[in-house]
Amino acid sequence: MLRLDHLYSIPRDKKDINNICARMCLDCMRNGYIEANEKHTFSLLYEDDAVEFIYQVVKNKLHEKFLYQLSSDHVVSELELASMVQKAMNSTANVITISGDISRCVLSGKCFEKEYGVHAFAKPDEIIEKMAAYMLKHKGVFVEEDQLQLSWWQKLWNKWKWLLSVLVPFAENLI
């Protein structure tokens, strides 16, 4: 069993906003302010790192433990994250501090790292810069809910990529 700690990714449109980083970017663009609880700390795990971690588990047949916690072990507070978003978006948006209960939501990935020798490579500030750049470039998709304008080859790829995902395993079985 795998537990993923605060998984985040770069959203492609508004329906993909399912993590705190993307929500803060959207709030910054739409509302002009970002709300953050200064007493809430957590660890972020980027999707590429999660995929690598899961691959390592699937690749090995024998496991020392039943439960692994996948975490980047890079602890950040909501206030620090809001500051990163503000900087990445080149914004003068206000960061509104919300007082709440002290909470620390950090899973320890030490057992996984010890057994598999793998650690997270993604740096949250670099990924947030990429996320902010993408969301600002496609502001209409996120704020005004316009449709993402794709080129003809991207539309073709999106329509037919299922075929490739079926044919590759079929070809592997033939070989």
Predicted segments, located by residue:
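Short, cationic, amphipathic peptide segments
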Residues: 167-175
